[in-house]
Amino acid sequence: MIERGKFRSLTLINWNGFFARTFDLDELVTTLSGGNGAGKSTTMAAFVTALIPDLTLLHFRNTTEAGATSGSRDKGLHGKLKAGVCYSMLDTINSRHQRVVVGVRLQQVAGRDRKVDIKPFAIQGLPMSVQPTQLVTETLSERQARVLPLNELKDKLEAMEGVQFKQFNSITDYHSLMFDLGIIARRLRSASDRSKFYRLIEASLYGGISSAITRSLRDYLLPENSGVRKAFQDMEAALRENRMTLEAIRVTQSDRDLFKHLISEATNYVAADYMRHANERRVHLDKALEFRRELHTSRQQLAAEQYKHVDMARELAEHNGAEGDLEADYQAASDHLNLVQTALRQQEKIERYEADLDELQIRLEEQNEVVAEAIERQEENEARAEAAELEVDELKSQLADYQQALDVQQTRAIQYNQAIAALNRAKELCHLPDLTADSAAEWLETFQAKELEATEKMLSLEQKMSMAQTAHSQFEQAYQLVVAINGPLARNEAWDVARELLREGVDQRHLAEQVQPLRMRLSELEQRLREQQEAERLLADFCKRQGKNFDIDELEALHQELEARIASLSDSVSNAREERMTLRQEQEQLQSRIQSLMRRAPVWLAAQNSLNQLSEQCGEEFSSSQDVTEYLQQLLEREREAIVERDEVGARKNAVDEEIERLSQPGGSEDQRLNALAERFGGVLLSEIYDDVSLEDAPYFSALYGPSRHAIVVPDLSQVTEHLEGLTDCPEDLYLIEGDPQSFDDSVFSVDELEKAVVVKIADRQWRYSRFPEVPLFGRAARESRIESLHAEREVLSERFATLSFDVQKTQRLHQAFSRFIGSHLAVAFESDPEAEIRQLNSRRVELERALSNHENDNQQQRIQFEQAKEGVTALNRILPRLNLLADDSLADRVDEIRERLDEAQEAARFVQQFGNQLAKLEPIVSVLQSDPEQFEQLKEDYAYSQQMQRDARQQAFALTEVVQRRAHFSYSDSAEMLSGNSDLNEKLRERLEQAEAERTRAREALRGHAAQLSQYNQVLASLKSSYDTKKELLNDLQRELQDIGVRADSGAEERARIRRDELHAQLSNNRSRRNQLEKALTFCEAEMDNLTRKLRKLERDYFEMREQVVTAKAGWCAVMRMVKDNGVERRLHRRELAYLSADDLRSMSDKALGALRLAVADNEHLRDVLRMSEDPKRPERKIQFFVAVYQHLRERIRQDIIRTDDPVEAIEQMEIELSRLTEELTSREQKLAISSRSVANIIRKTIQREQNRIRMLNQGLQSVSFGQVNSVRLNVNVRETHAMLLDVLSEQHEQHQDLFNSNRLTFSEALAKLYQRLNPQIDMGQRTPQTIGEELLDYRNYLEMEVEVNRGSDGWLRAESGALSTGEAIGTGMSILVMVVQSWEDESRRLRGKDISPCRLLFLDEAARLDARSIATLFELCERLQMQLIIAAPENISPEKGTTYKLVRKVFQNTEHVHVVGLRGFAPQLPETLPGTDEAPSQAS
């Protein structure tokens, strides 16, 4: 067994309290015992500093600072050192029994920052007799010594023979040496690794469960699977390299594309310009001929337009002369129509006002009667009201007098006075001074009779007044009617004038009845007269158009002649139309056919070009589509044969590649599983043992071992048995050989060697005969020889494969070209030449155009004659029906006669219309005019006088009645009778007063009502009188206006005037329309003449310019054609399909190509200059020079060693085939390199299972560990849910996410990161890149979650946390975790260092007093079982029975502080081996 390395001692030089002290370390437990400040922590700090000399990590805080994030300012190191040079050295011996001293030189740096300078070093080959203190100190005297600086130490060691001194500038190199020599358990490559190691030491130093370690147990316990990561990195590197190669190929393809683009654009640029010039030359020739034809045609058109202009100017002058007369007539007719319409409106108003006046007259008479009656009633009401008022006043007076008499007791006197007052009033009214009370009654009868007489007289006069008023009203009415008809006259003449007016009215009515017949007759004659005038005008116009005067009798014969001419010309025009239609149909058919052929020509030409290219590529001539299909079948057969041969060569090449890969495996293992099994069994492959066998001995040993040459050599077969149970991941036959791999020989077999063969006696009854292999593979030399031959074969196969691939791709491209040709051009490639047919059709089209032109000229003349004859017939058709009107000469006289009669009748009708109503009213009352009622006014005065007399008589009778009524008052004599009488009188007076007041009220109401009614009647009467007077005045004004107008206003006058106006308007409109037509036609004719004149000048100029241009271009075109033929590029430039494009399309094509060429040749000075010169449009030959320069440029860049052709186009085709083959080959290689997602998932899952098994094995070692109530400790390892889902998707659902893994833009790591983000969108990835995330996902450790659990008392298994455990339990559990970590590191690092080295194991524990005796014993047992060293710091009351104990006491002597150390070996019954460098007895050092 390999012995584990050990730390022999720790040496402190010039530390605080330790000048030169070496602590010999026990193989198990070393205890530092002492009180507070004794130096225990300083000793451990020196050990840790020598172990990890990283100032960024070192932090020696006190135990009380355990929870602090920062300790003292110097992190605890500066204060533990003394001034000057200090050392901390570890003396070790490894598994190879090599003594190695490693340490650091420390020195305080002056300054307030309290920094420390550290220099790590190592010493090898130091004799065992030399102590570390002797190296770094120099004895000056018996009690004085000096610490050597590092350079003197180096010089001192270099002087010693066999001793090596190494000083390190980096901590990484220092730790690398310590790892290689087995001092530390893990290779510390980075600051992160050093931090983990320091956290481990720090956790063990201060005890307890370190949260920094438990939070990241994966980093501490799980080894980094660098092999898998390296494989992925190599794979991605190979993929990157492959993709870079592909990118380089793409760049080459882009160059090829550039060449192809350059040729294509140069061809487009020059060919488009070349064909444009060719087309323009042909177009210019055609234009010159066309200009000449148009010049001749335009001259003929100008002459015709000039003749036409003269005729239209003459006709326009005639119409201008006639238009003035027509306008004057039309204006007169319009004015007459307006006068007639005005007169009619006036007549209508007059009639309406007359009717209104009659109605107002009637209403006025009625209202006069109503007002008269109202006046009478008003007078009666006034008299009644006045009487009632007088009676009331008298009664009130009497009543007042009576009341006064009662008050003063003078009633008799009052009544007497009242009677006297009444008597006096009666005397006054009746003019009777002698009137007495006794005679009052007699006078009353007299005055009553007088009143009755006056009333009768008044009634008689009233009757007479009414009769006189009626007679006076009728006379006035009749007189006013006569005055309205005849005008003012004397009243005595009214009777005679009225009779004369009635007789005249009868005559006027008779004449008025003849107005309508006369008007109809006049309208008929006027219409005939207008038709006669229109016929005369049409005849004059016809004669003017015909240029000859015709008699009326000649018109019918002329009409027949013109109709016969129209019939003949119509037949001619119809036949010409049919002939023209036939010619045009043929022309359109030719044009359509030409257009169709022109559309088909580019397709046919493209098909011919494609067919010619195919013929050149395959060297065959094709005359029909059947030839093409037959050759395509032959091509398919050749392609199939080439593909079969290529696939066979490719399969053989792949087999060679696989064999080379298999033989290139390290150790000669052809199966990777054997390496894993060898590592698992702790053995070595047999092929690895015989790896150095020579090439000559290889056949022998290959035959000797036969099938077992892939066996695994193990030290002990019995230890392998347990691993074989359930083993499935292994070859079908697994051979195991027991032996020492370091001293293995072939003595395990009994062998007889034959000629080129051996006989191996495996057992007594089993032999094996094996011949020497022709190609031995046993041993590195044999494999390298085979690999070399395989490489040579692979080169041959690769070359053959490339050739076949090139041929296959060439055949495939040819097949694709044939397929494209068949799909695009086969239908038209073997049809007739459309261009030849186009030439034939163009010649026929020219003949048709000439025939059409001649036909058009003839047809134009016939059409003019036909139009003239047609116009003549139309005019005669309008004239012939009016020949009888043209022969009637008396029509105008008859019209004048009827018009005079109509005027007389209309005058009579106007009289009847004006005075008819007055005559009708006058006729029944005309007799009243015989006498004039002049006494009407005197009668009115008498009637008024009688009314006054009747009123006075009534008042006198009333006064006498009152006297008679008061007659008793005169006879009152005594007061008693007076009182009694007064009482009765009072009541009567009151009753009469009430009755009188009521009567007065009624009279007042009646008076007010009748007064209001009378006022209303008077207002109505005044309104009627005002309306009557106003309308009478308006009527007189209207009659005067009608007389002033001087136009007859009958019902037909307006219609006749309107008809006359409309006829004149129509004539004027026709004349103006014709004049406008002539003006427009004349303007158009003049414009046409101007246009034709300008066109003639332009055509002459264009024709001569075109002729000159054609002649000039001919010389330049000849130079271009000569250059094209001399350089042999006519086939490239003369692209006939471009001849069918327009000049704009060709110019656009050339300009686009020019823009692309400027970019393409921007880096080529020569081509850029030639291109710039070629842009001159006046020098087309320079474009040919540019095209020749491009071809020459590309010919110079063709690699003749690869592509053997001078044609750049063919070179590009061959280059494209070769690049396509390389792309295909590299793409297949990339597919081989790429690892599948399922493989990744399997690798990670297997790694996880292996590590879970390893953790399970570690847990078995911790099952028996117990501290306090903690009965056991274990690690739980689980796969994270999100990562488990990722693995499931990678292994089972990867097809759904092939868009990520098949993307060329993503590496495998990036694709894995994208998939993880897709599956877990809720997780925030932060600022990390997909590449970083993917690399983390390739690390299996990130898939696992780890936590420590303890089995504590009755709680069962629970998570190990400091808060849930006691201090001792936490320390023990933490120590168990650290031990597990250290063991894991050793397992991880076993593959990295030599197999003969087992590293040192050492941990710390400060303040161990927190553990009880049982826990301390458990630690000792754990150290013994794991061969681990432990340094414990304990107070004075702890004295362990095992290991070595150092008693530390800090003392001060003469102001000098030092630590007194006493070492004691354990005294338990079972003593460990003696510590190196110490005696069994206790030792003491000062």
Curated annotation (Swiss-Prot):
Coiled-coil region list: 326-418, 444-480, 509-603, 835-923, 977-1115, 1209-1265
Residues reported to bind ATP: G34, G35, N36, G37, A38, G39, K40, S41
A GO cellular component annotation in the UniProt record: nucleoid
Region (Flexible hinge): 666-783
Matching SUPFAM superfamilies: P-loop containing nucleoside triphosphate hydrolases
Keyword Ligase: no
Intrachain disulfide bonds: none
Keyword annotations: ATP-binding, Cell cycle, Cell division, Chromosome partition, Coiled coil, Cytoplasm, DNA condensation, DNA-binding, Nucleotide-binding
One of the Pfam families matching this protein, by short name: MukB
Source organism superkingdom: Bacteria
Subcellular location: Cytoplasm, Nucleoid
GO function terms (MF aspect): ATP binding; DNA binding
Tagged with keyword Cell wall biogenesis/degradation: no
Principal localisation: cytoplasm
An annotated GO BP: chromosome segregation
Subunit and partners: Homodimerization via its hinge domain. Binds to DNA via its C-terminal region. Interacts, and probably forms a ternary complex, with MukE and MukF via its C-terminal region. The complex formation is stimulated by calcium or magnesium. Interacts with tubulin-related protein FtsZ.
PANTHER family xref list: CHROMOSOME PARTITION PROTEIN MUKB, DUF4476 DOMAIN-CONTAINING PROTEIN
Family: Belongs to the SMC family. MukB subfamily.
Domain comment as written in the entry: The hinge domain, which separates the large intramolecular coiled coil regions, allows the homodimerization, forming a V-shaped homodimer.
Function field: Plays a central role in chromosome condensation, segregation and cell cycle progression. Functions as a homodimer, which is essential for chromosome partition. Involved in negative DNA supercoiling in vivo, and by this means organize and compact chromosomes. May achieve or facilitate chromosome segregation by condensation DNA from both sides of a centrally located replisome during cell division.
Protein name: Chromosome partition protein MukB
Organism listed in the record: Escherichia coli O7:K1 (strain IAI39 / ExPEC)
Gene name of the record: mukB
